[in-house]
Amino acid sequence: MGQNSSNTVSSSQSSTHFESENDLLSWYDKKALKLVSTPELVSYKGNIDGKPLDAALNRKELMRVLRLQNANEAVEGLLFNCVQTLANFPLIKDCYENVTYMGVLKSCVLLNKNRCLEYVQDKRYNHTKLVYISLALNKAVKEMSSLPNSNDSLDAPKVIATFNNVAEEELVVPAETMLEFLTLMLTMSKATVIKNSRLDVNISEKWDSFKTCALSILRTMNTDILTSQDALKNVISYTQFQNVISSVCPNLLVPLECLMEHVLFLNRDLVDLEASKPLIPQSKLVTEPLLAQLATVWPRELVFSRLQKLYVGRDSGFSMRSFQAKAFKWMAPSILLVQGSRIPDDQDYAKNKNQRYKKFLDEYPRLKDEDQHILPALSGKRKLLFAILINEPWKVTNSELFGDIKTTIVQLSPIQEVYKASKPGNVYFNTLGGGIGIGSPQPIIKSSGVKFVPGNVSLTIDPNLEFAAFRNVGFGGSIAPSNTPTSEHKFLIQDIETWGCGGEKELEEQMKNWEWEEAEAQRRQRINLKSVNDDRALLELAGLVGQNQSGGSV
């Protein structure tokens, strides 16, 4: 793969033109070595048992180096193919039969966004596109030519900027493969909360539970997908992938970066984090897969810090009074979770199944037919799940509103969408019969009854915590809309819970603890390196001294 030095490669670090593919690959292999520190490189050599960097490895060996236990064949295949593509950077269009340990190290550099941008020397480089290409390219063996294909030399910046002339509009990722990738990201989210946390997780144990949450993200990418079986006959385009990453799941790829960075730590430098231990307590709604899904949207220090159970309807009863008694003493942000079964036919349900629903229909204004555009994934009697971040303490507001600009509605099932506050004053808790509202003005309450006034993007919960309605009809309210078609969904509430999050001080402290763990591991790496004293044999094994190599920076 061109790991050996070439006399034709310019010694200047600013070289941009190369006479052959071999020279180009060799130069970027060496540059990758300079973007990992000396302790990291020594640790990596220890993890691969001192094997030469140009030695080849197979799928099982890659899983061992990544410390992934019980990965299924699909996961092994997609990770191996991803590394196989990135190992040949910047000539990612041309993939080779063998993956080497140098290729794994180069992949580690490329999948770390900060290192990658430094590696390519372009702050505007589209890292998300690179990840997509690594998942999408069909791998083929190609003989390396010693000369460029034209009379011109190889222009490295052009090769990088054009992704080696890969046409992303022609690429697709099978939806089945993307589902496995999304499931892996969710499965590893809690275990990779820092780069050197111990991966003490059997990823096959709860795979199906995480896959259910991953399917919601997949449906957002491709709305033609309803079930996991539909993934067998659909694909995901780059545009679909990019749109979801940018607007719905900004943190989705973080576990991939952390997973790859584990190769730079020896076992003795890995730590057991409190966040990686089983959740205590859990509930019907708060599970590890759900928190992993939330972590694709919100910072992981918010999601994986010690959540406090405040109110669970199944335990305390479905009433505003119970909610108030349990949740109102919490003087910090909280997450409201609401799950229910969508009501597909209002009149039939009110007449034949639940006559109390007729009262809710009378109080809640009907959406115009021309504004109702229901996606297939949201049609019928489906489970709906919403998580709402309330950044201020709960309080009774029978006339006013509370809630700041950080209020966010996240739909988690059957698709994932994010609706952020556009202005403060977006929540009410009305004990006079108005119920709970997110994104709406106060309901009109008279002796004759209640009239809800739903905002353009809003979640309305009736005062008995029995029925709810989610509306998404565009701009104009206190919550901004998503890119999904306008629609409204009423549902029977089956579970409602409120969980307390740490305040800014607590979250900052949690983040500092995790940062300290990473810094401490790096400090131990440096101490361990110094302890070898003048053992040049180890350093030569790592390729840091001798053989005219300068090594990485400490």
From Swiss-Prot:
UniProt GO cellular component terms: cytoplasm
Main subcellular location of this protein, as a coarse class: cytoplasm
Domain TLDc: 284-502
Pfam families found in the cross-reference section: TLD (PF07534)
Compartments, record wording: Cytoplasm
Entry keywords, A to Z: Cytoplasm
Family in the record: Belongs to the RTC5 family.
Role, per record: May be involved in a process influencing telomere capping.
Full protein name: Restriction of telomere capping protein 5
Organism: Lachancea thermotolerans (strain ATCC 56472 / CBS 6340 / NRRL Y-8284)
